[in-house]
Amino acid sequence: GPGVCLKSEAMNLAVITELPLVVLDVQRGGPSTGLPTKSEQTDLLQALFGRNGESPMPVIAASSPTNCFDAAYMASKIALEHMTPVVLLTDGFVANGSGAWKLPKLADYPAITPPYVTPEMKDNYTPYKRNPETGVRYWAIPGQEGYMHILGGLEKDSNTGAISTDPENHNLMCHLRAEKVAKIPVPDVEVQGCADDADLLIVGFG
């Protein structure tokens, strides 16, 4: 709700810098202050489109209190492996709910493998050097010798990482960021009931 409105600038910064970030949104009734103690799934469109410019990001919704751990883990995996902010939607019922939950073993979860730079990249590293298959830029952690670079909210040149206002470069970078997000695998949609002769389709999330 209003909290996510105030965070949209930081979310947009994570989009253009291509840094991992998980934003947890506990939805409530709106608009404005609205219904601050009541539950409502009001922020889906805001999570998808509520930023300026071309700034796509994945959105995940938790379905129950016990599902929150799995959803948060997958949101973190997507953010870290694809160098993108991810929004995790919950709501008042989920946030205030409870349920029996067995502490999982991390070995049962898929590994998280961030796209860190490698030593052989040092000679030709640029901040937006990308994996040719996934489109994800490689991640140089601050302090790594030989990988000094500058990030920020200004558009950068796709090759050098320097500030650029060139329209062709900006168009390219917008497409590269969008294509990277579009390549993130999405699970198959689960259809319950017989879909062959149905007159009405109900789509739910969370």
List each model region and its residues.
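Flexible, low-complexity linker and terminal segments
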Residues: 71, 76-206
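Thiamine diphosphate
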Residues: 1-49, 58-80
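Short, flexible turn/loop "capping" segments at secondary-structure junctions
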Residues: 49-53, 194-195
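Glycine- and acidic
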Residues: 54-61, 197-200
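Flexible, active-site-adjacent loop/turn segments at secondary-structure boundaries
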Residues: 2-4, 42-45, 57-58, 92, ...
